[in-house]
Amino acid sequence: MEITGIICEYNPFHTGHLKQFSMIREKNPDSAIVCLMSGNFVQRGMPAIFDKELRARAAIYCGADLVLELPVTAALSSAEGFAASGVRILGGFCNHLSFGAETPNIDVLLKTADALLSADFNLD
């Protein structure tokens, strides 16, 4: 079974999110869409504009098959912690991850990922 995961907040859900669902369905029509969404608090500890139930219902209504809640400790952490937790959770059962980006240039994204994973950047 194909499963596409999305790490999200939907604060609020908008037409860009709907377009993401449409693009997933277009590229992989048989894939289930699972959203891992922050709860009533979003990144940086801000309260969400709408409660988590309403935001989850909007996602389901617009095409998501399942909405799960990102643990609050992950939602309230740094952007890196938010993303890393989401990838760790969804990576356990999703075949694909879908995300929006400021650039459509995949080469820029891949070079950035390589840099972030390099020994020069990580001092682990």
Predicted regions located by residue number:
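Nucleotidyltransferase catalytic core that binds NTPs
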Residues: 1-124
